[in-house]
Amino acid sequence: MIPLLLSLLAALVLTQAPAALADDLKEDSSEDRAFRVRIGATQLRGVLGGALAIPCHVHHLRPPHSRRAAPGFPRVKWTFLSGDREVEVLVARGLRVKVNEAYRFRVALPAYPASLTDVSLVLSELRPNDSGVYRCEVQHGIDDSSDAVEVKVKGVVFLYREGSARYAFSFAGAQEACARIGARIATPEQLYAAYLGGYEQCDAGWLSDQTVRYPIQNPREACSGDMDGYPGVRNYGVVGPDDLYDVYCYAEDLNGELFLGAPPSKLTWEEARDYCLERGAQIASTGQLYAAWNGGLDRCSPGWLADGSVRYPIITPSQRCGGGLPGVKTLFLFPNQTGFPSKQNRFNVYCFRDSAHPSASSEASSPASDGLEAIVTVTEKLEELQLPQEAMESESRGAIYSIPISEDGGGGSSTPEDPAEAPRTPLESETQSIAPPTESSEEEGVALEEEERFKDLEALEEEKEQEDLWVWPRELSSPLPTGSETEHSLSQVSPPAQAVLQLGASPSPGPPRVRGPPAETLLPPREGSPTSTPGGAREVGGETGSPELSGVPRESEEAGSSSLEDGPSLLPATWAPVGPRELETPSEEKSGRTVLAGTSVQAQPVLPTDSASHGGVAVAPSSGDCIPSPCHNGGTCLEEKEGFRCLCLPGYGGDLCDVGLHFCSPGWEAFQGACYKHFSTRRSWEEAESQCRALGAHLTSICTPEEQDFVNDRYREYQWIGLNDRTIEGDFLWSDGAPLLYENWNPGQPDSYFLSGENCVVMVWHDQGQWSDVPCNYHLSYTCKMGLVSCGPPPQLPLAQIFGRPRLRYAVDTVLRYRCRDGLAQRNLPLIRCQENGLWEAPQISCVPRRPGRALRSMDAPEGPRGQLSRHRKAPLTPPSSL
């Protein structure tokens, strides 16, 4: 008996040994790890157009400075995952970072590398396709750890119009309409974020800042607006509050349960309302349906809503449910997307019930049934109406998608176009690009046979209708950020101080009132365009509003290509998100440029010089003192053996250029040696420049990337800058005479072809402040600029006077020239320069009376050495000798 028990015990021990050994090894492995990465959340929610901080912290399992600790900086990698695809967002090690081009200017590590335990990621300007899983991975030596979190971007922008007519809302009416349907009027940032996520709508609509815009992914003749040939958000600028347009609404949180009521006999609108009330709910609003769709609701069944419209949400498109695009589909009576079905027609109904636990996102689409006819998408031919040149406005017709509805609630059943491949989610859809509808499609839309209408609307459980509210063109087939990766220093990773995606403009008198979205907003008509004003539009004068000039993302600069895996950085400096970058000048030489008073009164930027530098020598504790630059206010850091030295711009002093020696006048703002004042009053370019000159300034010149970021972020409007080619076509010069040291043109700009008069330059602030040339008679806001340090009137001399008209202020480095009065001869240098301390150089010119006969002797007597004529004097004229 005892041997049997011993054998059983031995067998039990041998059976348990592998598992126990594995547990011991696992514990040993866990204890042997140097650190563990934790995010601390399973799901995070962000708001469309907003910013989201994704936490990620490193927890050390043994002292970080122990003998076994790896030297150098840990390697941090953030990855975006969607389905079976992975996209690298950024990789950082110390002060070096590599950022995916699709995330450039949108991601930052606010604490790293100052804190090696906080590698949290900040993702700004959230888009719909930013929803997915984000993984944080940290590697240090041979140790690595990672954690992941799901991110959901909530919020949806949609076009809304009542069934009666297209373009029927004033600005106040638009706000009320969005509130009536359980939403609010969208902001420019939200519309732009939706556009970046693939949204397209060829219908002009109000936004919260009283501007009128519409997003276009695929430029086409009828939807070109003020950005002919380029994708982007078309913009009319601020228009009159009584003008009539559609409205873009924004819905975000559902805060309850939305469910489909589908009785066998269907319901009229009044019966649908009572149906919901009997179940302790109310008939859902349009905004609530959009919010539920954004949360995952997928129902291929048209149902009544509170505003009398009939709609249904589609997440997974199919051939029988409206084609290959996800979105909320709407049934219209007419091909121009107007007319809701009669309230006596019978449909299902969408009800909404307040609940602490919304369940709309868990709704699933109904199963497919065979033999069902498809919902027809009827398109109307696109048109473009152009006004004559004096009007500078035109009207565009939107792409039309609607379903003719019969009196019994049925719709057409013509064969739909071949659908694109059905994606799994709205953010993964890849569809055929929308092309302008043809004549045949329009004729099909008005010739639907009565017997081909729907017989049973329950068949709509597998059928969908397209409203072209969410368009994923072939060019944007992949919602995942892709593209080349560039490497930057960490100071370049953080997003700029400006919110790049803001589109607003301050209220001011708007452009001429023209109803309908313009196809060529504020642009002269092309050859062959009509010469009469189309009906429904009033003739307007030459004074125009502010267009948006491009929606094409700015091309990024390529950086170095060294790998992050090469080892830790040797530049341990604290990094944090920064705004405009510091101006750096690699030398101390003075500018050799000469500015005459007749052509310029300002030269920006003023480069640091020996005389301008009020800074001393600061001793630094280690090498790499100038990375990042310790100098403030645009000062230049120079490394020296004993430390570093800051060369200050005029107006600043101190060891680190942090002491202000001069200050701007009240109402002006200082930045890196210049003063700026913004005017929201809209003027033509010439009027704006004249107004600036009356203040002793000029329209702003942009000479550095830092100045570009400051002006664009500080004054978020379309605005004039001083660049123009009014003198010679194609030769762009700054109005203040500053050298052309920096350019930030929009792709394809400047494009003033055929002498169209686009001779002045506007800064389009929401496109990272990129520039476009436009006609000078546009009325835009503007910013004036003058030097922080300037000189007053030049010294007056009794026998000499300056060239040009006197001015009250002269910028640093401005050079004036004296000339002697008639009958006097000049001696010594006639030039004086405005110095960095705001004082003129002492004049050295002297004027003496001319000696009699001087002019004759200058023509006859040799002036140079050895009897040679001076190089700059003409040879005496001798009459030809006779042969």
Swiss-Prot record:
Residues 789-849 form the Sushi domain. Residues 35-154 form the Ig-like V-type domain. InterPro entries: C-type_lectin-like, C-type_lectin-like/link_sf, C-type_lectin_CS, CTDL_fold, EGF-like_Ca-bd_dom, EGF-like_dom, Hyaluronan_bind_Proteoglycan, Ig-like_dom. GO terms for cellular component: extracellular matrix; extracellular region; glutamatergic synapse; perineuronal net. Residues 1-22 form the signal peptide. The modification Phosphoserine is found at S224, S413. Residues 402-592, 854-883 are annotated as: Disordered. Residues 156-251, 256-353 form the Link domain. It comes from the Eukaryota. Residues 581-592 have a biased composition (Basic and acidic residues). Disulfide bonds join C56-C136, C178-C249, C202-C223, C276-C351, C300-C321, C626-C637, C631-C646, C648-C657, C664-C675, C692-C784, C760-C776, C791-C834, C820-C847. Glycans are attached at N129, N336, S413. Residues 479-495 have a biased composition (Polar residues). PROSITE patterns: C_TYPE_LECTIN_1 (PS00615), C_TYPE_LECTIN_2 (PS50041), EGF_1 (PS00022), EGF_2 (PS01186), EGF_3 (PS50026), IG_LIKE (PS50835), IG_MHC (PS00290), LINK_1 (PS01241). O-glycosylated; contains chondroitin sulfate. GO terms for molecular function: calcium ion binding; carbohydrate binding; hyaluronic acid binding. CDD domains: CCP, EGF_CA, Link_domain_CSPGs_modules_1_3, Link_domain_CSPGs_modules_2_4. May play a role in the terminally differentiating and the adult nervous system during postnatal development. Could stabilize interactions between hyaluronan (HA) and brain proteoglycans. Belongs to the aggrecan/versican proteoglycan family. PANTHER family: AGGRECAN/VERSICAN PROTEOGLYCAN, BREVICAN CORE PROTEIN. This is Brevican core protein. It comes from Mus musculus (Mouse). The gene is Bcan.
